[in-house]
C-alpha cells in the first residue's frame, strides 16, 4: 500500500485517541522502565504513554515513514524508529508493549500475540486494542462496492483487501494468552461517534480501512469508487434527530500481564 496520510488520520484525532487512552488506563503498571508503542502512528498514543510514565524510556515504532515524521514533530524528545510489528524483536525486554489499532492489519494472531507476549520482561504487560468492525456497514459496503464496479479487477478479492478472517473472537485472545499470563483482561466496546454527514464517515475510513481498496485504483476509478461508496454509506447511516450520523465502531481490548 501507499504510505499513510497523517493529516487525514488525525482529522478525527479525539475520537481515535479515546480508545487509546482507555486501553492505557487499564495497564497495571506503576513504573515501567521501557515502554514500546508498537504501531505508534502520528504519536498521539505515544504522548499518552509518556505522560502517564514520565520516568520511562518510551519508544514509538511504526512501518510508515510519514507517520514517524509526524510523531517526531509532535514529540521531538522521544525516540521513534521504523519497525514491523510482525517481525520486530527488541534489543532488551520491554516492561510494556502497547499496540493500539495496529495488530488488526496483521495475519495469524494465534502466533503473533503469544510471540509479542513472550518478548516482555518479567511482570511486563502486553496491551492491545483492535477495531472489530469488519461486519459493520462501513466495511461490508467496502467489499460490496469493490466487487460490483469497473474497479473490481484492480482491487482483486474484496475479502483479501478487507482483511477478513484476521480478527478472532474476544474469548480466543483470552485462551491464547491465559496459559502463560498471570492476569488477562479482555473486553469489547462499541463506540458511537457523532459524524457530520456521510462524507465525514467516508473520510474516517479513507484514512484506514478503505486504503487497500483505493490504493490500487487510478484517479478515475478511485473517484468512481468513492462516489458509489459514499452513496451507499449515506443510505446505511441515516440522519439522526439532530441531522448528524452515528458511526458505530466496535473495538476489542486485551491486557495481559506476565508473572514477575
Curated annotation (Swiss-Prot):
GO terms for biological process: methylation. Pfam families: Methyltransf_12 (PF08242). It comes from the Bacteria. SUPFAM superfamilies: S-adenosyl-L-methionine-dependent methyltransferases. It is found in: Cytoplasm. Keywords: Cytoplasm, Methyltransferase, S-adenosyl-L-methionine, Transferase. One of its GO terms (cellular component) is cytoplasm. GO terms for molecular function: trans-aconitate 2-methyltransferase activity. Its EC number is 2.1.1.144. It catalyses: trans-aconitate + S-adenosyl-L-methionine = (E)-3-(methoxycarbonyl)pent-2-enedioate + S-adenosyl-L-homocysteine. Catalyzes the S-adenosylmethionine monomethyl esterification of trans-aconitate. Belongs to the methyltransferase superfamily. Tam family. NCBIfam families: PRK01683.1 (NF002463). HAMAP family: Tran_acon_Me_trans (MF_00560). This is Trans-aconitate 2-methyltransferase. The lineage of its organism: Bacteria, Pseudomonadati, Pseudomonadota, Alphaproteobacteria, Hyphomicrobiales. The gene is tam.
